[in-house]
Design a protein with these regions (language model features):
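Short secondary-structure transition hinges
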Residues: 127-159, 177, 200-204
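Hydrophobic alpha-helical connector segments
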Residues: 98-128, 172, 176-182, 229, ...
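Helical hydrophobic small-molecule/effector-binding pocket
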Residues: 112-133, 155, 183-190, 194, ...
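C-terminal peripheral helix-coil segments that are non-catalytic and often amphipathic
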Residues: 1-11, 15, 20, 154-155, ...
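Generic hydrophobic, amphipathic alpha-helix propensity
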Residues: 35-43, 60, 85-89, 93, ...
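Amphipathic alpha-helical linker/stalk segments
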Residues: 88-112, 142-151, 160-166
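Helix-turn-helix
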Residues: 38, 49-80, 84
């Protein structure tokens, strides 16, 4: 496989000496195709450093250790680069949630497992998660790969809702509407967590259980005959207050 090297060469001066020669020690060698992945990682790193509003291709190149022109070999502008970061994030989210599905679980338990994996992904990847669903990417409809990856990740939930409808567990309604009802609940919880809403707040139980109960209650909204769920289960645990830090 052809090897591609990006060195911060800088502009050539009249005597032929490259202005970037002083940076040769920081040059990074990439096999063909790896530069693209390195730029995606560098993008997330710079978002953590300065925020998406101050993101620049020059800063991304600096973090990746390549020339300032290197990002343009793969992406025409910052927006296209952000769309690609989101695309990869949707792919990773699909893998994180779909691997939770198993025939040994009931449909409701599969939904609970995928929902927890969804929240875990958001907590582990707050910058990418906000990019996936936030307003930073312009003209989102122009990026077919990103849209397809997003649909695929959402279809993990839709497929389970369809199973529930076929089994007579869920309301016999549009699967997309029912799935969206569940997703908005889980997405809202994930967003509150990564925005710090639960930091230093006292909860009536360990946070993992707090989260599971919310997801379980949310799934009952689309069930035909949801099992009884009373507040006593929560009330009995009020002596185990913890903080989510």
């Amino acid at each position: 496989m052809q090897q591609m090297t990006d060195v911060s060469k800088g502009d050539q001066s009249k005597d032929g000496q490259g202005k970037g020669d002083q940076n040769k020690d920081s040059a990074v060698n990439y096999h063909h195709g790896n530069l693209r992945l390195a730029l995606l990682d560098a993008t997330v790193a710079q978002i953590k450093e300065v925020g998406v509003e101050k993101l620049s291709l020059r800063g991304i190149a600096r973090i990746a250790g390549v020339s300032q022109t290197a990002p343009y070999r793969h992406f025409k502008d910052k927006n296209e680069l952000l769309a690609e970061v989101a695309t990869q994030a949707f792919i990773d989210l699909y893998q994180a949630t779909s691997q939770q599905l198993t025939p040994q679980r009931t449909t409701c338990k599969n939904i609970e497992a995928t929902a927890l994996a969804y929240v875990d992904f958001a907590i582990a990847n707050p910058e990418r998660y906000k990019l996936m669903f936030g307003p930073s990417i312009q003209n989102r409809r122009s990026y077919s790969n990103m849209l397809a990856a997003g649909e695929r990740s959402f279809n993990v939930l839709i497929s389970q809702v369809e199973h529930g409808i076929e089994e007579g567990i869920f309301l016999n309604d549009c699967a997309m509407i029912l799935a969206n009802t569940l997703w908005t609940q889980v997405h809202g919880i994930a967003s509150l967590i990564i925005d710090g809403f639960y930091q230093n707040r006292e909860l009536p139980m360990p946070f993992d259980e707090f989260l599971r109960i919310q997801i379980s209650i949310a799934s009952r909204a689309i069930q035909i005959n949801p099992t009884a769920y009373t507040a006593s289960r929560i009330a009995n645990k009020t002596d185990r207050q913890v903080r989510f830090d």
